[in-house]
Structures are given as structure tokens and as C-alpha cells.
């Protein structure tokens, strides 16, 4: 099975399954001399981990990070960094009961047909638990970006029909749905709890803003920055749509309104608006990157649904495991990580673009 690596100069390879002994990531291309502690990586993992609030899965994983290689005396050595998180609260008993059924919305059927064999425990490799490694690597990417004064901010923009209108970044970590609009956060929480009570789930929209991105990140044609960002966030389980800048709204705007006119700010060229989401010709123009991603409602729900067995017989399924009623709040740090990994990779690639 290929497809577990991401990046070119700053490259990560994640490994592990939802109910295996553990998960992790190997990072290549991190420069030597970066001060890093397990506690710094742990802060990011704590934002993503299970059982953190009433709107997340009840699975209780500590997600304690262990640095296995690539760091000595508190600094990176320039060699591959290996990070490990052990699984401690996996319960495969519920999956034993439905292992011959294809769960609607999951990768059971496609994995079965493609590989002829699959790990049915919690989805195995297709589970969002795989993103532990991404978030851990993203913590290091964020620290490297911070040295260049680039900051990544993610939040929940929408849950179901409830959309954040008032954006205050200080409010993001003050509520369990990571919404920058305090009043809307309560409505989101109530909506998620109603869905959970009925055995259903909700989707949402996560927004990520990258501040301080310099002019020049991205390559022409196939390695455009917006193309790589889209691939990065689309690789997150449950993500079904991506919008950069004005995105789909651009289809309703005339060119005279959509074009970002150039002006002078602080003696430098800048754009008066940011409908392009900072990227022109696949290359960043120095404004804030704004990217939104749509996450579908959690596929595992405690409602009866029609399906078929591996032998092609009609069946009914009800998924009774421990699952998030809405993945948007925990998808925030994952989306931040993927944006950070994309930007740091392009940052290093840009260093070699001219003498």
C-alpha cells in the first residue's frame, strides 16, 4: 500500500492503524538545531485527542508522544525524526460483530475490493486516528514556520446550519467546538448534542488562516501552492470540499468585483481585497492565506441503515462504537497541521528558486 508520505523537502510518512499497538510518523528534512520538546508536540496532540469533551468520541486515549529518534539534548540533529504514540483504549469487540458488513460512508468496501484483505477494527488505516502522526509532525512544522513569523490559525466556521459570523480568534480555544463566535458556539454545541442523542451526526466547515506568508511560495503548473494545499486538506478523512479565498462565491461575482486590485501599503505592493486567497498563478502574494474545508457528517451512526455483506446479501447495520457526533472541532488541529506541513515544504523549496 503506497500513499502514506507527504512533502518533498520536508517529508513525512505516517504509519499505524486505529486499533493497532500504536501510530506514529517519520519526518525527513527537518534542519538540525531546532529546539523541540515532547511537551510542545503534546500540546497539539491534546487539541486533537479523543474524549476531550462532550461533543467528541468517548474513546479515552492519552496520546502521549514519544520522540524515538532525531532529537538529542533537546535539539533536532538533522536525521529522521521518529515520533510514536501508543494506543491504550482500543475496543475491537463491536467491530467483531459487524466485520462482514460494509459500513455506509466508510472505506470497508473499497479496501476489501482493492486489497482483498482489510483490518476491520475501527477502520484500520483508513481511520482518522491515523492523523495523530500528522498533528505531531505539524507541531514541528509550526515551530519552524514561527521562526519565519508565519502563524497558522484554525477554527470551526460552521456546524450543521449554524455559521460563525463574528470572528474573534481569542474565543477559539474558549469553547469545546473551537468556534470564534461565542454565541454561535453554544448553538453548535446544542446541535451536536441533539444529533448525538438521536444517534445521528452533523457535518461542518473548518477554516484555516495562515498569516505572515511571504511572497513567492509555490511553483508553477503542477506544484501550485493552492493545488498542494487542496491536496493536503483533502487527504484528511471526512473532508469533501475545499475553498480558497472567495472560492465558489467567485462564480457569482463579475471580474471587476472578483479581481484583487493592487495598492501600495507600507511602501510595498499589496492587494485591496483577498478574493484569490493570497495565491496568484500558484504562488503566494504576501497576503493571508484563507482556506475552508467541508467535513461530512460522521459516517458511524447509531441508526439502522441498509447495507450488504461481503457475500453480497442484503443486511441492516447499526454502528454502536464510540464515535464523534461531529468531527469539525477535532479536525481543526489536523487541518492546521496539513497547512503547516505544506507551507514549510514550499518555504524550503523556494529557497532554491534563485541565486
PLM region spans:
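N-terminal, positively charged regions that mediate nucleic acid binding
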Residues: 1-59
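Internal helix-turn-beta structural module
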Residues: 11, 290, 300-355
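A short glycine/serine-rich beta->alpha loop
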Residues: 11-14, 119-130, 215-216, 274-279, ...
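Glycine-rich anion/phosphate-binding loop at the beta-strand->alpha-helix junction
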Residues: 15-21, 199-202, 206-314
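Alpha-helical support elements that line or immediately flank enzyme active sites
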Residues: 21-33, 129-150, 223-231, 287-289, ...
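Glycine-rich, N-terminal phosphate-binding loop and its surrounding beta-alpha-beta segment
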Residues: 44-104, 108
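Short acidic, glycine/tyrosine-flanked loop/strand segments centered on an H-E-D-like triad
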Residues: 99-124, 305-323
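Glycine-rich, mobile lid/loop segments that gate access to catalytic sites or pores
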Residues: 113-221
